[in-house]
């Protein structure tokens, strides 16, 4: 999965990190490239929009919205967003979108490389991903 900073959080903005993730994981954005991959999201309007639903279906994702009223279904993502807000967003007043992208990008890179996460067995996200990919191979 990628990340994206935009002024408007619409369905187009919601699709961008998915495009980034597909390119990184599969080398391209193409129909059915993500077959077998489940995409968990909440019930925000950007994720329920026909454009969003049709795009992820075309790419082969299994659409798995979180259960209404049960944020723990999406707990890892929700916890990361809380950390991002508390450790990055609330500490800065960005001059513009470019500065926001630079600072947020640096935080995400540091988080993935250095942040020890209990849920991941006290490993960094990068370590957990490498080990998961190695086990899947």
Predicted regions mapped to residue ranges:
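Charged DNA-binding/catalytic regions of mobile-element recombinases
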Residues: 1-137
């Amino acid at each position: 999965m990628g990340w994206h900073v935009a002024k408007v959080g619409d369905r187009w903005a919601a699709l961008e990190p998915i495009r980034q993730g597909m390119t990184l994981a599969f080398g391209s954005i193409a129909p059915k490239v993500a077959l077998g991959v489940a995409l968990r999201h909440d019930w925000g309007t950007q994720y329920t929009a026909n454009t969003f639903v049709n795009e992820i279906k075309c790419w082969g994702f299994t659409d798995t919205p979180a259960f209404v009223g049960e944020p723990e279904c999406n707990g890892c993502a929700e916890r990361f967003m809380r950390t991002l807000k508390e450790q990055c967003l609330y500490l800065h007043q960005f001059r513009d979108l470019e500065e926001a992208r630079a600072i947020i990008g640096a935080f995400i890179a540091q988080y993935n490389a250095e942040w020890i996460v209990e849920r991941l067995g006290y490993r960094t996200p990068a370590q957990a991903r490498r080990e998961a990919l190695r086990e899947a191979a």
